[in-house]
Regions:
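Bacterial N-terminal signal peptides that target proteins for export
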Residues: 1-9
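N-terminal signal peptide c-region/cleavage motif recognized by signal peptidases
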Residues: 15-19
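Electrostatic cytochrome c docking/interface patches
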Residues: 29-54, 65-79, 210-212, 230-238
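The canonical Cys-X-X-Cys-His
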Residues: 56-67, 222
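Detector for the c-type heme attachment site
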Residues: 64-69, 197, 201
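Membrane-proximal low-complexity regions enriched in glycine and acidic/polar residues
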Residues: 98-190
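Extended, hydrophilic extramembrane loops/domains of integral membrane proteins
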Residues: 188, 194-231
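Juxtamembrane interface at the cytosolic side of transmembrane helices
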Residues: 237-271
Length: 271
């Protein structure tokens, strides 16, 4: 029985790299992007995070909030790494909508919302009924291995960033109306139709670093930024995991040598 289980597990692992079934079924197409932060030693590309922040600010922020992301983290070394004065200026210029979640920013004496400061979070934005994007990269899965096993995540991660980028480039241009709502065909969305109009077309923003701003690159940049927003401490966790594995390896080696030195000579002896 155990032999059969071992053979089955080995067979599943052999198939895992090739198995890339989309989350929720086989009718989605999730493209496998080569993000810099993937893998055990991957790190965020600071320039890409800055470009993604620009895409969010100039495009996505019109409908989506990031209310669980502190503005001060934009200066983090492992994040976008903006200078502190630039973060303060960015915060002060960010528009705040009149929503219940933003009431703590309301100045009753001046009868208006006060400007944001770097110790605040990004403001909430539910005006269009759109979801908050703070944790969207963790709540969406692009890859699954053989059903129920989750083996593909071992090699590729859950694919939240891939799902977001694939969604951005997955619009086919086809539209239909259902119950008075315009739906847009999207090859990455479950069911194939989504109520969100295409947010990106390519050349939507002008990057200061001169980087290509076609649709594919804009999609990659916003996906990477949202992955950082959801997992700002990913690099620290990877480092801690590496140190933990190294420590356990050394400990296991010492225990083996101790056993060999102290107990191995006495094993098998008859008393």
């Amino acid at each position: 029985m155990f032999k059969n289980l071992a053979i089955g597990a080995a067979f599943a692992l052999a198939l895992a790299p090739a198995a890339s079934f989309a989350a929720g079924g086989g009718d989605q197409h999730i493209e496998d992007f080569a993000f810099s932060f993937e893998g055990p030693f991957g790190t965020y590309d600071q320039n890409q995070l800055q470009r993604g922040l620009q895409v969010y600010t100039e495009v996505c922020a019109a409908c989506h909030g990031l209310q669980y992301v502190p503005l001060r983290t934009l200066a983090d070394e492992g994040g976008p790494g903006l200078p502190e004065d630039q973060v303060r200026a960015y915060a002060a210029g960010f528009a705040v909508l009149d929503e219940e979640a933003n009431r703590y920013l309301y100045d009753a004496e001046k009868d208006e919302f006060r400007p944001l400061i770097d110790s605040d979070h990004f403001p909430a934005n539910h005006a269009a009924g759109a979801p908050d994007l703070s944790l969207i990269a963790k709540s969406r899965a692009g890859f699954h291995g053989p059903y129920g096993l989750g083996i593909n995540q071992l090699f590729k991660g859950i694919g939240g960033a891939e799902y977001i980028a694939s969604l951005m480039i997955g619009y086919t241009g086809e539209e239909k109306e259902e119950a008075g709502t315009i739906l847009y065909e999207n090859t990455a969305f479950p069911g194939g139709w989504i109520s969100m109009a295409p947010p990106l077309y390519g050349e939507d923003v002008e990057y200061a670093d001169g980087h290509s701003n076609d649709l594919h690159h804009e999609a990659e940049d916003i996906a990477a930024f949202l992955m950082w927003a959801a997992e700002p401490k990913m690099m620290a966790r990877k480092q801690a995991g590496f140190v933990g594995v190294l420590f356990l390896t050394i400990l296991a080696s010492l225990l083996y040598l101790t056993n060999k030195r102290l107990w191995a000579p006495h094993k098998g002896k008859k008393h």
